[in-house]
Amino acid sequence: VAKDLSLSAARLEAAWAGLDNVTAAKKELIEEAEMEPEDDFGEQMKLCGQAGSVWKSVTAGSEQIIEGCKDIVDEVGSQKIGKPYTGEDVNYIESPHSWNSIEDFYDNIVSVRNAYFGALGATSAQTYSVSAYLAGVDQAANEGVISAIEKCLEKIAAMPKPFVKNYKDAKVKDAIDACNDLNDALEVARQALIND
């Protein structure tokens, strides 16, 4: 399992940064498994709207990022937090033994913020980000996403720890609702882009 995970992580890094931009050990691991990524995802994103890009427009590339964000938010809200809370599957709790579930949920939403703002660790829109692009199309939709991201982070952080012992707390429902609100805001943003 560890080898498969290591290979998957190396392949993901190579798909984003390009095979020539990973360590020699990772490149060797990927090549030995014959699992070279077909496209350099990061380069494809940078080329949105240009000839040869997977995404024929900046809008299409932005929509792809928003869809990925929606997938993450839905997984956090309806599955990772929601399944235990609703009783659908109380064994679905992420990191139950380390008691890090809430940190994991929070970090998942931070990854959405990073994707939306266009950089790792970004707390505001970078020049070439979905947020900056959407602001030029529909500033209200952009502000709605930003506000919903921050509210979602706030509500997840407010859940009592550890999650494994508090998954029925009322603040858990607040976090689920905030995830749903963020998903709705992302859909408004997606619609604003495709209807522009």
Predicted regions and their residues:
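Mature extracytoplasmic or organellar-lumen-exposed domains after removal of signal/transit peptides
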Residues: 1-196
